[in-house]
């Protein structure tokens, strides 16, 4: 973090330490402003950064530390920076892994002296600056492009419990979108495992997209203040590329729910009374502070894709419901589908997008998507009857619907590039036209007599045709 403070810094001293929260006393009449940065000196080479959150009295502030407070004691000196905490931005951070306060954490060289710094707190773009894009953001993932298309400059989130594939989807999207759009990617890892961050860094290096990517990590072992502000640090980097360098940016956040959890920890340490289900009373405003800054302006856009952990698979959870309200596309991951190895485990009925409109995606795409949904919904309605009585008890029309629904669900599975090491299957990126053609052929009955396995984990439908031809040849 650059020392971008005023020429004269106001000094004070610690009067109390409550875990990650510290109280600092300053001279009368020079109290730092809310959200201003505080540097707490200690014997170690790296000082502790904190952020002002409360004014307790005319001479005392309460601040949240963004680093480890172990070793601090009352009486230690502290300095107000005169500005909010700032993060490095621009080309200097591309290919680098930073912590929540913008310090390199990848054992690489120090950032160059010419690096530009920018405060992590900023206002959302004014309404007259916003640009309304209706350009579809193609991901190459069949089920998303068909049923929950993303918009360039919009916000999408993947909802799911633990272990259903959110992080794998995020990693695949980084790879495919950087290759397709040649833009900048900014990844915020909030409250996730160190192992996952290491794997992501290696994957980005191996795929050659790291030079166009900046990573910001606030890992699960770090203090809540660091996890709480890692998202704003990453967003500030993305805003600089959008506003100053006029680049289109892909902002990926894994995991927004961990940011909410960190905010809850901070809220408790600050002494605020919890609200519904124990969440912080500022839940809505904290989520909005992040989400409303993710926007498109004339000439450049920030497209955001976020992973959201759903506690106990409860989609009525207040934090999950609040995040839903800010999105253009919602991609819901199903534990049932994951248990059946139907990857990506995207629920075709629960997932939705405001972009799935005939005026935006075209009449053919809209009609095919609706037929796919209707067919799968009909199959799910019949599943209980099938379990009790068997498929033979269904009418011929219902049996045909079941047959096509099961083949559609298998066609919408897809191997990913980032999972080749685990599955041994080469990843596929599929154009929307190929996805629509494949679904249309299945709906029209072409695959009625094919083995379901022929459609499983493929890209385009032609692969299934080849499997069927090979199978027929082997049997003849």
UniProtKB/Swiss-Prot annotation:
EC nos: 7.1.2.2
GO MF terms, alphabetically ordered: ATP binding; ATP hydrolysis activity; proton-transporting ATP synthase activity, rotational mechanism
EC main group: translocase
Cystine crosslinks: none
Keywords of this entry: ATP synthesis, ATP-binding, Cell inner membrane, Cell membrane, CF(1), Hydrogen ion transport, Ion transport, Membrane, Nucleotide-binding, Translocase, Transport
Segments crossing the lipid bilayer: none
The reaction(s) this protein catalyses: ATP + H2O + 4 H(+)(in) = ADP + phosphate + 5 H(+)(out)
Subcellular compartments: Cell inner membrane
Binding-site residues for ATP, renumbered to this chain: 160-167
UniProt cross-references to InterPro entries, sorted A to Z: AAA+_ATPase (IPR003593), ATP-synt_VA_C (IPR055190), ATP_synth_F1_bsu (IPR005722), ATPase_a/bsu_AS (IPR020003), ATPase_alpha/beta_chains (IPR050053), ATPase_F1/V1/A1_a/bsu_N (IPR004100), ATPase_F1/V1/A1_a/bsu_N_sf (IPR036121), ATPase_F1/V1/A1_a/bsu_nucl-bd (IPR000194)
Pfam families listed in its UniProt record: ATP-synt_ab, ATP-synt_ab_N, ATP-synt_VA_C
Primary location recorded for the protein, binned into one broad class: membrane
Topology in the lipid bilayer: Peripheral membrane protein
GO CC terms, sorted: plasma membrane; proton-transporting ATP synthase complex
Record text on subunit structure and interactions: F-type ATPases have 2 components, CF(1) - the catalytic core - and CF(0) - the membrane proton channel. CF(1) has five subunits: alpha(3), beta(3), gamma(1), delta(1), epsilon(1). CF(0) has four main subunits: a(1), b(1), b'(1) and c(9-12).
PANTHER family membership: ATP SYNTHASE (PTHR15184), ATP SYNTHASE SUBUNIT BETA, MITOCHONDRIAL (PTHR15184:SF71)
Role of this protein: Produces ATP from ADP in the presence of a proton gradient across the membrane. The catalytic sites are hosted primarily by the beta subunits.
Matches recorded under NCBIfam families: atpD (TIGR01039)
Family of the protein in this entry: Belongs to the ATPase alpha/beta chains family.
The protein, known as: ATP synthase subunit beta 2
Organism: Bradyrhizobium sp. (strain BTAi1 / ATCC BAA-1182)
């Amino acid at each position: 973090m650059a020392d971008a403070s005023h020429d004269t810094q106001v000094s004070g001293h610690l009067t109390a330490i409550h875990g990650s929260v510290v109280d600092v006393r300053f001279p009368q009449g020079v109290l730092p402003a809310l959200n201003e940065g505080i540097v707490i000196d200690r014997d170690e080479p790296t000082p502790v950064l904190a952020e002002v959150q409360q004014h307790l009295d005319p001479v005392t502030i309460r601040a949240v530390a963004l680093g480890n407070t172990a070793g601090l004691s009352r009486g230690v000196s502290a300095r107000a920076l005169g500005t909010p905490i700032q993060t490095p931005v621009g080309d200097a951070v591309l290919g680098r892994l930073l912590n929540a306060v913008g310090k390199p954490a990848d054992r690489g060289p120090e950032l160059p002296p010419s690096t530009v710094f920018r405060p992590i707190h900023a206002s959302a773009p004014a309404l007259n600056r916003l640009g309304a894009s209706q350009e579809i953001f193609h991901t190459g993932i069949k089920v998303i492009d068909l049923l929950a298309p993303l918009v360039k400059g919009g916000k999408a989130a993947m909802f799911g419990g633990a272990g259903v594939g959110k992080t794998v989807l995020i990693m695949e999207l980084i790879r495919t979108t950087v290759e397709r759009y040649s833009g900048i990617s900014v990844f915020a890892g909030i409250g996730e495992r160190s192992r996952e961050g290491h794997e992501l860094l290696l994957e980005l290096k191996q795929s050659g997209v790291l030079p166009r990517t900046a990573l910001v990590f606030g890992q699960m072992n770090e203090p809540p203040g660091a996890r709480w502000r890692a998202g704003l640090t990453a967003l500030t980097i993305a805003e600089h590329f959008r506003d100053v360098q006029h680049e289109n940016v892909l902002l990926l956040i894994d995991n927004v729910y961990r940011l909410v959890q960190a905010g809850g920890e901070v809220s408790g340490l600050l002494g605020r009374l919890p609200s519904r289900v124990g969440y912080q009373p500022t839940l809505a405003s904290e989520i909005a502070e992040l989400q409303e800054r993710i926007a498109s302006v004339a000439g450049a856009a920030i497209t955001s894709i976020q992973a959201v952990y759903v506690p106990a698979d409860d989609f009525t959870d207040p934090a999950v419901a609040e995040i839903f309200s800010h999105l253009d596309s919602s991609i819901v991951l199903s534990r049932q589908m994951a248990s059946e190895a139907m990857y990506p485990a995207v629920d075709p009925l629960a997932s939705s997008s405001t972009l799935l409109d005939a005026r935006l995606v075209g009449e053919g795409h809209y009609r095919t998507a609706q037929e796919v949904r209707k067919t799968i919904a009909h199959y799910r309605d019949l599943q209980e009857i099938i379990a009790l009585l068997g498929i033979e008890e269904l009418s011929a029309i219902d049996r045909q619907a079941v047959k096509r629904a099961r083949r559609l669900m298998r066609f919408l599975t897809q191997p990913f590039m980032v999972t080749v090491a685990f599955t041994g299957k080469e990843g596929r990126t599929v154009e929307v036209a190929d996805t629509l053609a494949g679904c249309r052929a299945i709906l029209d009955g072409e695959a009625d007599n094919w083995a379901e396995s022929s459609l499983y984990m493929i890209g385009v439908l032609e692969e299934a045709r080849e499997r069927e031809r090979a199978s027929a040849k082997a049997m003849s």
